[in-house]
Amino acid sequence: MFLQPLLAKKIIAEVKKMYEREVIIVNTDGLIMAGTNDERVGQFHEGALICAKERRSVIITKEDETRLKGVKAGINLPVFFDHDVIAVFGLTGEPAEIQPFGELLRKMTELFIKESRHLEQSQWRERMLESFMIDWLQLKEWSPSFLEKAQLLGVDLSSRRQMILIQGYEWSPHDIEQMARSWKSSYPADLFIRWGNERILINHEVPQHEQRDRLLRKILHICSFANTASSQYTAAGAGRAVASSSLTDSYEQAEKALAVSLKRKTPIFEEDLKLDMCLTEISPGTRNEFPQRVLGKALEHQELMNTIRTFFHHDLSLKQTAEDMHIHINTLRYRLAKAEQLTGLRFDRTEDVVTMYVALYFLDQDTK
């Protein structure tokens, strides 16, 4: 591994905050990559080259300034990664004074590089997982390269799989990492993938004796963490368990379940969908037109629409609706009569009640 100039500049920027003397970072060929003095960047530093080749600290004296090219009195320290010298850290000043700082800054630099490398590897794996998942959902037949990726990622293609979609708001990489660690502590073979800015995709490897309650508890735990992290509601939809070769079916089911979860504000398993299963199949054009056709002029009265929603929420109970809205029951009867007048529908006819419910379903879901 070689230290990249961009990372070297970031390290120098951090060093500047805690150390006032001149500092440089030099590559293993002796070229200065970054420093507190920009004029020295790109220059050759013979002392650093010796330091890199001999894998040892090199003290530069005033006398050395005349015989070694590009040096200033100070100290050069090798920076190690996995036992290899990847750069040289140089400090200008009296060696006895600056050596303690030099050792401290070198250790800090090595830790910084390790963290950067870990993040780089993590991001590489995330990109590879996302690419692999897209292939898995799109390929009609598994190609040799796909099978090779599966083997590299340790994915068992013979197991049954279940797709789970979680949707919220943008999470930080740290939040994603924490959620992934929590999930994989229970299901280590699962693929936990950031799926766009607002979604997480979980490719769940279904155990032989799956316990749905356990899976639901884990989904609720992740949603609870995500809600806290973003201060917004997080929805979750789960498809059915399928063979690995039929993963697209489970993904489409998870999409349907997620749409219902956004409305009901609770995690949804596709296998539990009943009326929603039919309603999610209706075309967008019909979904947009139907509320206008059914509710008509009632849509212009916000208080009236809130009353209708609350009435349905309480299963058409006059008493519970009036209590929830803090209004007299006669006021509620007046509003419902007004709704019947504007819509031409009646709350004592089953067909009209179903029609109005479906109109509200489409209206509320499509305005989210």
UniProtKB/Swiss-Prot annotation:
GO terms for biological process: positive regulation of DNA-templated transcription. Pfam families: Diacid_rec, GGDEF_2, HTH_30. It comes from the Bacteria. One of its GO terms (molecular function) is DNA-binding transcription factor activity. InterPro entries: CdaR-like_regulators (IPR051448), CdaR_GGDEF (IPR041522), Diacid_rec (IPR008599), PucR_C-HTH_dom (IPR025736), PucR_C-HTH_sf (IPR042070). Gene3D superfamilies: PucR C-terminal helix-turn-helix domain (1.10.10.2840). Belongs to the CdaR family. This is Uncharacterized protein YsfB. It comes from Bacillus subtilis (strain 168). The lineage of its organism: Bacteria, Bacillati, Bacillota, Bacilli, Bacillales.
